[in-house]
């Protein structure tokens, strides 16, 4: 399989060569990506559902206080019959069929999540929206990080993928409003498709490819 060529820029936004990325991660065609949009959708829906706390709750008529006796006699008052002042139709009454705490998480096979990520990355790569930036930061500097990213992504929302060793890069990009930093071992489909650009640091790309290649061989 032929590899995918990704452009590399330096910390000044100037071209600094290219890097080869595995076709199995970045090289699916637009037709193949389109055919797997339902897969991407299913994985993203499951991920967003798993992020929900599910702690919503209301009190039903058995949980609210009061209402131990019948408010008035059954007949002879001219009013509608009532059995409790805590019935749902009463002010301060219990809620009927209200939400209860629940777990929204869905079971998604690992192979589905891995495949969805590959198709999402391929979609961005097919549209020229995957890049590699060699930040080369000796100390944290948001100004330098902006200078490195601006020529590549302008003001578009960008997911920046870093290795665990890219401490200076992480501290530099985390305060940029249009940038969402994430470590290579945490990259997921949702953070790819919600970004207009996906930018890898050189170490971040190496870490990502190494992890996915090792997982496939295992």
Swiss-Prot record:
Region feature Disordered, mapped onto this chain: 54-106
Pfam families named among the record's database cross-references: Ribosomal_L4
Biological-process GO terms, alphabetical: translation
InterPro entries the UniProt entry points to: Ribosomal_uL4, Ribosomal_uL4-like, Ribosomal_uL4_dom_sf
One GO cellular component term noted in the UniProt record for this chain: ribosome
Superkingdom of origin: Bacteria
SUPFAM superfamilies in alphabetical order: Ribosomal protein L4
An MF annotation (GO) of this entry: structural constituent of ribosome
Intrachain S-S bonds: none
Alphabetic keyword roster: Ribonucleoprotein, Ribosomal protein, RNA-binding, rRNA-binding
Signal peptide feature range: none
Quaternary structure note: Part of the 50S ribosomal subunit.
Function (record text): One of the primary rRNA binding proteins, this protein initially binds near the 5'-end of the 23S rRNA. It is important during the early stages of 50S assembly. It makes multiple contacts with different domains of the 23S rRNA in the assembled 50S subunit and ribosome. Forms part of the polypeptide exit tunnel.
Record-stated family: Belongs to the universal ribosomal protein uL4 family.
Name assigned to this protein: Large ribosomal subunit protein uL4
Organism this protein belongs to: Bifidobacterium animalis subsp. lactis (strain AD011)
Gene: rplD
């Amino acid at each position: 399989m032929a590899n995918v060529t990704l452009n590399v820029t330096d910390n000044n936004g100037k071209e600094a060569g290219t890097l080869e990325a595995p076709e199995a991660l970045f090289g699916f065609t637009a037709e193949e990506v389109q055919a797997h949009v339902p897969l991407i959708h299913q994985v993203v829906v499951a991920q967003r559902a798993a992020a929900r706390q599910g702690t919503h709750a209301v009190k039903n008529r058995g949980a609210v206080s009061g209402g131990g006796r019948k408010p008035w006699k059954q007949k002879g008052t001219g009013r509608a019959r009532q059995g409790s002042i805590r019935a749902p139709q009463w002010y301060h009454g219990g809620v009927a069929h209200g939400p209860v705490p629940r777990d929204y998480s869905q079971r998604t096979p690992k192979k589905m999540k891995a495949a969805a990520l590959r198709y999402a990355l391929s979609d961005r790569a097919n549209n020229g929206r995957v890049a590699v930036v060699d930040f080369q930061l000796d100390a944290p500097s948001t100004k330098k990080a902006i200078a490195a990213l601006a020529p590549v992504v302008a003001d578009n929302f960008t997911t920046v993928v870093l290795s665990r060793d890219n401490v200076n890069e992480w501290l530099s990009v985390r305060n940029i409003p249009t940038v969402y930093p994430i470590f290579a071992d945490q990259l997921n489909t949702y953070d790819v498709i919600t970004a207009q650009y996906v930018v890898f640091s050189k170490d971040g790309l190496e870490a990502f490819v190494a992890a996915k290649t090792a997982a496939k061989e295992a």
